[in-house]
């Protein structure tokens, strides 16, 4: 282990600059249609059907036809690395990637994940994630996605897809749609109005489709009473017609409930082709689909459309040109015959480092300045004594938390614990390190009592509902720290006047007890940082870089402040909050958060000046023809807004300039302000830079339910530019 600060190498930057293969959808469809003519009916239904659970080396495998040169597709999780394979890179989770607010890093992370997937022979990587979006702060899988804000989620989805598909792997946007909790996820109906669907939950999928995503995964839940994977309004009307999606829709694993209904409403591929039992059951397609065509229940044209979409996506990514063979077996330990990790540890470390959010820093306690002694307290500071991969699918919270749990995980090739990195630094500067690596409050206080500085590590975990951890069935039962974290901090802070708290968490944690301790002088949110956890944290704690992460969600003073929680006892969720989730809810109801959306401190200071608004837009609905991503004129530029950001401190740092827009009164009720632009500016001390935000018609439109179109309203739009959703430094307006 070393403590150099990595930089993205030229190769990584080159990967990040990629968009995707040069083939167009039209050219891909031409090739797919030529192949279609050569396939038998048996081969067609094989292309659209999984081989059944554990029927091949990957978590999903399709049948390979003999009539054309087309393989058995390998489909494999996941959103932070390749599941059931080793060695691979265990990247920071999506929620950390979102917290970087850095387009280049989002794309570089996606490119590196895609490169590893292709190297292992994975054709379809089951990522990225826009659902769960995060309307429920305790929801189990929020960490797989990027943020609770639809605009930021959409940008993160697009950048990640460009990175992944630029490396040659098919991306899969998931979970489509309204899969916002783990409790009862396979029976719950998410009942939502049309405007909320479009402006909140569908918004990031617009960006995914616009980025030419190859595939979309429909979710387990029902939507307005009908299963997502046989919901014509969701699969056909919205996705394929309104958004102009030209790829294919696959089911989540065992989320299909019918043969005919799923086929006729827009499902294109069933995964894994059966349920999880042995011998396999619930085989809805393959021969059963052929029979449904033969008896007239499913039109032949629908099956041909399924096959064409799947083949076209394969051609779009040019996977017909020397694609690697599958190099691992999920069911046999996952040991790969090739090492695909390259220099990706540098990217993982950079994302983890630049996602760290400094929440509190009284008296400039951080960065550390070679203290004579440090107490490191808490089980979250060390690697699980049984190893970082001891629990299947990371289904435990033992040792430092660097992944959530469930199918969206990967095997750690190694895990650098915070204590390891701190000890490495301390050995070079003469700092004595004392430890208490349990969560026992008395032992923690004993270790901290005589130290110059105490660093307490606490965590809060969550994951997928098929695993229950410490009584949490995927979703968290509350927003408290686990393992008595509040009591641990109280005990340490009672005896040490310089107590620093580091939080590893899958989502918001209520920090009121911790912040009430006068001796808690700094709080660091480190999220779900992946394999380079300790190194990234040390880079920030010791001042090698200034923290530049910003919260991808709001941290409230209580769980009740959010106005949403997961629905219990098998009931449906009627989404009564509508458009008003996370900061939109806090703003509407004038609730003071503890730390607002977009918040994050630095070791330097930034000023904002010179707001310039150059917008020229006309009111009214979209009128363009539907293209990939929706109505073509939806993405027309209406001008720019810019501001100057100056680093007025003495050290280098990076500021995220954020643009929020408030709609005129002529529009239906909307959130007081909505994120509509951001730019991360790295600036040396004394330097300045210009943040420029280009707005499209979509950015200043609302969804008109009556017209079924996006509409730009007349009137005065409010412009807010600042360092967070509530730290507004400049404001102005423009009129349409």
From Swiss-Prot:
GO terms for cellular component: extracellular region. InterPro entries: Cellulose_deg_GH3, Fn3-like, Glyco_hydro_3_C, Glyco_hydro_3_C_sf, Glyco_hydro_3_N, Glyco_hydro_3_N_sf, Glycoside_hydrolase_SF, Ig-like_fold. GO terms for molecular function: beta-glucosidase activity. It holds the Pfam family Fn3-like. It comes from the Eukaryota. Glycans are attached at residues 224, 295, 363, 429, 607. The active site is at residue 252. One of its GO terms (biological process) is cellulose catabolic process. SMART domains: Fn3_like. Its EC number is 3.2.1.21. Pathway: Glycan metabolism; cellulose degradation. Keywords: Carbohydrate metabolism, Cellulose degradation, Glycoprotein, Glycosidase, Hydrolase, Polysaccharide degradation, Secreted, Signal. Residues 1-21 form the signal peptide. It catalyses: Hydrolysis of terminal, non-reducing beta-D-glucosyl residues with release of beta-D-glucose. It is found in: Secreted. Belongs to the glycosyl hydrolase 3 family. Beta-glucosidases are one of a number of cellulolytic enzymes involved in the degradation of cellulosic biomass. Catalyzes the last step releasing glucose from the inhibitory cellobiose. This is Probable beta-glucosidase L. The gene is bglL.
């Amino acid at each position: 282990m070393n403590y150099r600060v990595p930089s993205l190498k030229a190769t990584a930057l080159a990967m990040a600059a990629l968009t995707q293969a040069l083939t167009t959808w039209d050219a891909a469809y031409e090739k797919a249609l030529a192949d279609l003519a050569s396939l038998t009916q048996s081969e067609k239904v094989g292309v659209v059907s999984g081989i059944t659970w554990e029927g091949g080396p990957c978590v999903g495998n399709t049948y390979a036809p003999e009539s054309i040169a087309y393989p058995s597709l390998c489909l494999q999780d996941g959103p932070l690395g390749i599941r059931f394979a080793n060695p691979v890179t265990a990247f920071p989770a999506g929620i950390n990637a979102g917290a970087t607010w850095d387009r280049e890093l989002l794309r570089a992370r996606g490119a590196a994940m895609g490169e590893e997937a292709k190297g292992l022979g994975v054709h379809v990587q089951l990522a990225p994630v826009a659902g769960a979006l995060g309307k429920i702060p305790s929801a189990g899988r929020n960490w797989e996605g990027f943020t609770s804000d639809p605009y930021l989620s959409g940008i993160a989805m697009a950048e990640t897809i460009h990175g992944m598909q630029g490396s040659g792997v098919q991306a899969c946007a998931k979970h489509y749609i309204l899969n916002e909790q783990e409790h009862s996820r396979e029976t719950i109906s998410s009942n939502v109005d049309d405007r909320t669907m479009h402006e909140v939950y569908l918004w990031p999928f617009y960006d995914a489709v616009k980025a030419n995503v190859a595939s979309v995964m429909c979710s387990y839940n029902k939507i307005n009473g009908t299963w997502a994977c046989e919901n014509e309004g969701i699969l056909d009307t919205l996705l394929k017609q309104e958004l102009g999606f030209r790829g294919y829709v696959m089911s989540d694993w065992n989320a299909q409930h019918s043969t005919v209904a799923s086929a006729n409403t827009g499902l294109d591929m069933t995964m894994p082709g059966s349920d999880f039992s042995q011998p396999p059951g619930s085989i809805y397609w393959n021969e059963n689909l052929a029979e449904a065509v033969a008896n007239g229940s499913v039109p032949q044209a629908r099956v041909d459309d399924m096959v064409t979409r799947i083949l076209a996506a394969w051609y779009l990514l040019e996977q017909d040109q020397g694609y690697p063979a599958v190099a691992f077996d999920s069911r046999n330990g996952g040991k790969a015959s090739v090492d695909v990790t390259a220099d990706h540890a540098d990217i993982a470390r950079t994302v983890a480092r630049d996602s760290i959010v400094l929440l509190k820093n009284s008296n400039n306690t951080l960065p550390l300045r070679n203290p004579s002694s440090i107490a490191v307290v808490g089980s979250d500071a060390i690697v699980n004594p049984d190893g970082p991969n001891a629990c299947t699918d990371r289904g435990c919270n033992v040792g430092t938390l660097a992944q959530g749990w469930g199918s969206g995980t990967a095997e750690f090739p190694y895990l650098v614990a915070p204590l390891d990195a701190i000890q490495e630094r301390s050995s070079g500067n003469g700092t004595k390190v004392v430890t208490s690596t349990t969560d026992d409050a008395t032992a923690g206080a004993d270790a901290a009592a005589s130290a110059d500085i105490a660093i307490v590590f606490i965590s809060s975990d969550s994951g997928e509902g098929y695993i229950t951890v410490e009584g949490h069935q995927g979703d968290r039962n509350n927003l408290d720290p686990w393992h008595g974290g509040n009591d641990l901090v109280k005990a340490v802070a009672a005896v040490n006047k310089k107590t620093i708290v580091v939080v590893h968490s899958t989502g918001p944690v209520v920090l009121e007890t911790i912040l009430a301790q006068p001796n808690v002088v700094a709080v660091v949110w480190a999220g779900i940082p992946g394999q380079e956890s300790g190194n990234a944290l040390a880079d920030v704690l010791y001042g090698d870089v200034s923290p530049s992460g910003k919260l991808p969600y709001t941290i409230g003073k209580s769980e009740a402040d959010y106005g949403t929680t997961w629905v219990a006892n098998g009931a449906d969720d009627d989404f009564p909050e509508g458009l008003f989730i996370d900061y939109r809810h806090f703003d509407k109801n004038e609730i003071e958060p503890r730390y607002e959306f977009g918040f994050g401190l630095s070791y330097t200071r930034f000023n904002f000046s010179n707001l310039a608004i150059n917008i020229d837009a006309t009111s009214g609905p979209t009128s363009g023809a539907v293209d990939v991503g929706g109505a073509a004129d939806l993405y027309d530029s209406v001008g720019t807004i810019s501001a100057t950001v100056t680093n007025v401190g003495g050290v280098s740092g990076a500021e995220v300039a954020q643009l929020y827009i408030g709609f005129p009164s002529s529009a239906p009720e909307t959130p007081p302000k909505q994120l509509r632009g951001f730019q991360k500016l790295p600036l040396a001390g004394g330097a300045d830079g210009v943040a420029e935000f280009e707005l499209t018609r979509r950015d200043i439109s609302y969804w008109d339910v009556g017209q079924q179109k996006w509409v730009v309203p007349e009137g005065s739009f409010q412009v807010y530019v600042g360092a967070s959703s509530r730290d507004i430094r400049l404001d102005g307006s423009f009129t349409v």
